[in-house]
Amino acid sequence: MENTGFYVIPNKTQYEIGERVWLEIKKTGPTKANHVKVSLFTYQGENLKMECTLEQGVYIPLAESISEKTGGYLVKIEFFQKTEKLGSCYTAFDVVNCWTEAPRYGFLSSFSEEDKQKEEYQEFFREMHLNVIQFYDWMYRHDEFYPESDIYTDIMGRKGSMTAVAKKIEGVHACGAKAIAYGAVYGAESFQEEHPECSYRYDNGEPMIFIDKIWLMDIHRLSLIHISEPTR
């Protein structure tokens, strides 16, 4: 028997020691359920059981003791109308000292001006428990990250907004994940014109060029290659 009127997700993609764990119950259709039973399990067995009414709100706080030590938890939510069980659903969460103990990778790749108000990705990351999000191709150019104005056109001809990038960083942090910047330090555009000797080349001497736009550079020539401050 499965619930069709609700699903549940944690309010963050991952929790650090001491962070209070909240479960968000989201309604997906009509239901007669008026209260729930919450059960937490570890590999050692059942860890916690509690009940609450749905009238108490869509967020259920778990005991603070849950986040006092590291571990992973399976969550089972059972929905009832009085004593009749209507269905159930599941989610999970983990508690860590640092995200590097259990990284789960996701990415964002759209940074247009229209995207800066969109927040749907936060719920998706929470549902999928993705806790480290790479901002892919967020920059103006591979060898010149920041444009002169907020709105820019990247090397692929796509419109972007640095305000949208900043807003999405805030959104990623708000849902408990970490934001990391993609940076192809081996790729260059205008820089290669000043230092063609740093280009990787085939045996015939022709430079290695990706999609006819990005020159592949020999990053071992540190005395010649410029590494921009944001990459350090």
Model-derived segments and spans:
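Active-site-adjacent "subsite" loops/lids of carbohydrate-active enzymes
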Residues: 181, 185-228, 232
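The substrate-binding groove and active-site-proximal loops of carbohydrate-active enzymes
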Residues: 102-115, 145-162, 217-224, 228, ...
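Short edge beta-strand/loop segments characteristic of extracellular beta-sandwich folds
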Residues: 20-28
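An acidic-aromatic substrate-binding cleft motif
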Residues: 87-141
